[in-house]
From Swiss-Prot:
It is an enzyme of class 2 (transferase). It catalyses: L-seryl-[protein] + ATP = O-phospho-L-seryl-[protein] + ADP + H(+); L-threonyl-[protein] + ATP = O-phospho-L-threonyl-[protein] + ADP + H(+). InterPro entries: AGC-kinase_C (IPR000961), Kinase-like_dom_sf (IPR011009), Pkinase_C (IPR017892), Prot_kinase_dom (IPR000719), Protein_kinase_ATP_BS (IPR017441), Rho-assoc_Ser/Thr_Kinase (IPR050839), Ser/Thr_kinase_AS (IPR008271). Widely expressed in embryonic and larval neurons that contribute axons to the nerve ring and in hypodermal cells, including lateral seam cells. Also displays a punctate localization in muscle. Disruption phenotype: Expanded cell bodies and ectopic neurites in many classes of neurons. Overlap of anterior lateral microtubule (ALM) and posterior lateral microtubule (PLM) neurites along the anteroposterior axis. It comes from Caenorhabditis elegans. One of its GO terms (cellular component) is dendrite. GO terms for biological process: cell projection assembly; establishment or maintenance of cell polarity; intracellular signal transduction; negative regulation of cell growth; neuron projection development; regulation of cell shape. This is Serine/threonine-protein kinase sax-1.
């Protein structure tokens, strides 16, 4: 009788390869089902559009031929591998703890995008892989005017790339820094649009958890779009709140009694605001108190954040802002004592009542039980035309001079616009080889079939030519 062979010890490398293979196979079949459903939906929308227009048989057939041609192009283009060399880097428009955002132009279509570039090594080291995966998954699923649209996602050995629509209006943080405070009419408009965006995310089954002015982007007309979904629920680790949990939450005896003039407080807040936006930890100003607690939270935490933003729009700074994030954290935890309204910045009774209904206990918070329908009944926003708000002109006009206008963004002077030399890294040195970034690639149907209007492309090319000519003339 032969001896039983001892069990072979499986190496970590083999386990990682097996895990990646399993994820790839599962993803492949899941994507096949999803793509089939999406194709059927596009055909259904086409037929509905054809029926609504009352076209002749010849016109209907022509529409169907164009659609089938697009579907064929889409299948072919999906097989092509995207790299950074398919884009021209124009300008750095944002920088964060883990990467940067660039204004780019796609070579074959001439279309302008905002490209978020994230370093894989930083993602793995700082345990942010689940966050970027969440953002990629939600942006690929979301197809709505209230959410920033992602057209492509891809990766190379060093970096992850999210290619999104460029929104030249900037963000709400920049607008608030410029304007100090907003009128109640303007506040009603922006709070209503933000509420519609939040409700859409909730309808997908997600909680955003990071609602703040930085993440409320403005399109070319000045309408709101929600962005940055890296902290949506479904994740087991919430990096930012973990950072605060070891801090003391009790207030010193004289903590609230210190007088602080509103104008001076607003100036201090503005001075520190951008530094918070670009830091790893950020600021706890907009985070609901229950998110810091171990007992859990619900989607109502997003409505708390909206109440804090509303306060900032009307008063000029968030209700719990302090010189140090530790102090802000203590104020948020003890909101019953620290949520006060300054006497030198008068606001209406309706506005104050709405803020108090957003910033209160989770179980009785505005929006907690009835969602958007409950918020619509609030006196402060009852005059809003909710069904047609996106067709209406925003209260504050956004100035956009060209398709690549970045005047509503911060300047990042003397930045190197060359692409990272990621291809020099060998595959075996690739960060995150245990399946973190498997199946990261995404291509949107209307992104692959759209072209820039010829007139816009010619204007853009002429503007670039003039700019280069001016720079050469200066150097001569």
């Amino acid at each position: 009788m032969g001896e039983i062979a001892p069990e072979m010890e499986i190496s970590q490398y083999t386990k990682d390869k097996a895990s990646c293979t399993r994820i790839s196979i599962e993803s492949y079949y899941s994507k096949r089902v999803t793509q089939c459903a999406e194709r059927e939906n596009r055909l259904k929308k086409l037929e509905e559009d054809i029926s609504a227009r009352g076209l002749s048989d010849e016109e209907k057939e022509e529409k169907r031929k164009i659609h089938h041609s697009k579907e064929t192009d889409y299948l072919r283009l999906k097989r092509t591998r995207l790299t950074v060399n398919d884009f021209e880097s124009l300008k750095v428009i944002g920088r964060g703890a883990f990467g940067e955002v660039r204004l780019v132009q796609k070579h074959d279509t001439g279309h302008i995008y905002a490209m978020k570039i994230l370093r894989k090594s930083e993602m793995v080291e700082k345990e942010q892989t689940a966050h970027v995966r969440a953002e990629r998954d939600i942006l690929s699923e979301a197809d709505c005017d209230w959410v920033v649209k992602m057209y492509y996602s891809f990766q190379d050995y060093s970096n992850l790339y999210l290619v999104m629509e460029f929104l030249p209006g900037g963000d709400m943080m920049t607008l608030l820094i410029k304007k100090d405070t907003l009128t109640e009419e303007a506040t009603q408009f922006y709070i209503a649009e933000a509420a519609l965006a939040i409700q859409f995310i909730h309808s997908l089954g997600f909680i955003h958890r990071d609602i703040k002015p930085d993440n409320l982007l403005l399109d070319a007309r000045g309408h709101v779009k929600l962005s940055d979904f890296g902290l949506c629920t479904g994740l087991k680790k919430f990096h930012r709140t973990d950072h605060y949990r070891n801090w003391p939450s009790t207030l010193p005896p004289d903590f609230i009694s210190k007088p602080f003039e509103s104008k001076r407080k607003a100036e201090t807040w503005k001075r520190n605001r951008r530094a918070y936006a670009y830091s790893t930890v950020g600021t706890p100003d907009y985070i609901a108190p229950e998110v810091f607690q171990p007992n859990g939270y619900t989607k109502s935490c997003d409505w708390w954040s909206l109440g804090v933003i509303m306060y900032e729009m009307l008063i000029g700074y968030p209700p719990f802002c302090s010189e140090l994030p530790q102090e802000t954290y203590r104020k948020v935890i003890n909101w019953q004592q620290t949520l006060v309204f300054p006497s030198d910045v008068p606001i209406s009774i309706e506005a104050k009542a709405t803020i108090k209904r957003f910033c209160c206990e989770a179980e009785r918070r505005l929006g907690n039980h009835g969602g958007l329908d409950e918020i619509k009944q609030c006196p402060f926003v009852k005059r809003i035309d909710w069904n047609h708000i996106r067709e209406r002109p925003p209260p504050i006009r956004v100035t956009v001079k060209s398709i690549d206008d970045t005047s509503n963004f911060d300047d990042f002077p003397d930045e190197d616009l060359t692409w990272p030399t990621s291809t020099l890294i060998r595959p075996e040195e690739q960060p995150g080889r245990r399946g973190e970034f498997v199946d990261f690639t995404y291509k949107r149907f209307d992104g692959l079939t759209q072209k820039m209007r010829y007139s816009d492309l010619k204007k853009f090319q002429q503007a670039k030519k003039n700019k280069k000519g001016g720079q050469q003339g200066t150097s001569d």
